[in-house]
Amino acid sequence: MPHHYILTMFGLLPVATNISTWWNFGSMLLSCLMLQVTTGFFLAVHYTANTNLAFSSIIHIMRDVPYGWMMQNTHAIGASLFFICIYIHIARGLYYGSYLNKKTWMSGTTLLITLMATAFFGYILPWGQMSFWAATVITNLLTAVPYLGTSLTIWLWGGFAINDPTLTRFFALHFILPFIIISLSSLHILLLHEEGSSNPLGTNSDTDKIPFHPYHTYKDLLLLTLLLTLLLLTTFFLPNIMNDPENFSKANPLVTPQHIKPEWYFLFAYGILRSIPNKLGGALALVASILIIMTMPFTHTAHVRSMTFRPMSQLMFWTLISTFMTITWAATKPVEPPFMMISQTASMIYFMFFISNPILGWMENKIMKTM
């Protein structure tokens, strides 16, 4: 397709005039995905998926490969930025009622699950202490599945313990899943433009729209510049800020770390898992903490789409955000009082948002009718 057709297509794409900066994070996620695929490819060229050589190959990339340190740090910090952007993107969808576009919301949730799986497999690849033990703890949750659990776990591991076959298949999955993410992203964008973007007021934008290019392209470029600046500053000045000190030691199955935890972007789900003192219950809560956002389009009872004019729902929304942060913080702490009590309370409040949302919507409808 000639370039001028692509420019015309973007130029003629009608977008609401009043969409705010919160709508920029979709394009930020696309930029993060391109960055991750590019840096990931160059890292995969030098990486060795072998339990004896994986840790050494990471050191080789960092020390001997030209600009290998930059690719590795950019890839690791890029993953954190990816999750920051996706969590903001989801929060915006919850606040402004974007979930009412059901097909887009469902494809987006599928994308989130695929992204989380990809990031989890990537965290295992350096074969450090925390990589090994996080893989052991999380994959071991499959044994909680009644009847099939043990067989599923052995099938996933490729043996009776995490070993060479596990690392090889995790590397294969980590390499192939980003291409599935690209396909799902294309579907997500296609489904979005079938109906069009929402706006902060939650009203129909058909009467007041402007071309995507040049207005929104420049707006997106501004945030993209800020994102890249933040990424490069972190990569060059604080490259290990997101790393766990335990992961600088090679995986040792005979020594258990004092406190096993995954990367920060999984801590909210891990905190919910840990707060339930039952293996099956914890595993179900972990899955529910992510899948529950799929229920949002079906539990929306408010006559107004956005939370802009719904103060009660706003209060619950910001409670959800602070709860998310509280669970993330509590999950970094040891399994002992008062952290367990904090995790359990915060987990209850987290799920309460999704249960109370339809009730609050109904109450707000009643209040609006009386005014």
Curated annotation (Swiss-Prot):
Heme b b562 binds at H75, H174. It comes from the Eukaryota. GO terms for molecular function: metal ion binding; ubiquinol-cytochrome-c reductase activity. A ubiquinone binds at H193. It is found in: Mitochondrion inner membrane. Its cofactor is heme b. The keyword rRNA-binding does not apply. Gene3D superfamilies: Cytochrome Bc1 Complex, Chain C. Its main location: mitochondrion. Heme b b566 binds at H89, H188. The keyword Electron transport applies. SUPFAM superfamilies: a domain/subunit of cytochrome bc1 complex (Ubiquinol-cytochrome c reductase), Transmembrane di-heme cytochromes. Keywords: Electron transport, Heme, Iron, Membrane, Metal-binding, Mitochondrion, Mitochondrion inner membrane, Respiratory chain, Transmembrane, Transmembrane helix, Transport, Ubiquinone. Component of the ubiquinol-cytochrome c reductase complex (complex III or cytochrome b-c1 complex) that is part of the mitochondrial respiratory chain. The b-c1 complex mediates electron transfer from ubiquinol to cytochrome c. Contributes to the generation of a proton gradient across the mitochondrial membrane that is then used for ATP synthesis. Heme 1 (or BL or b562) is low-potential and absorbs at about 562 nm, and heme 2 (or BH or b566) is high-potential and absorbs at about 566 nm. The cytochrome bc1 complex contains 3 respiratory subunits (MT-CYB, CYC1 and UQCRFS1), 2 core proteins (UQCRC1 and UQCRC2) and probably 6 low-molecular weight proteins. Belongs to the cytochrome b family. This is Cytochrome b. It comes from Casarea dussumieri (Round Island keel-scaled boa).
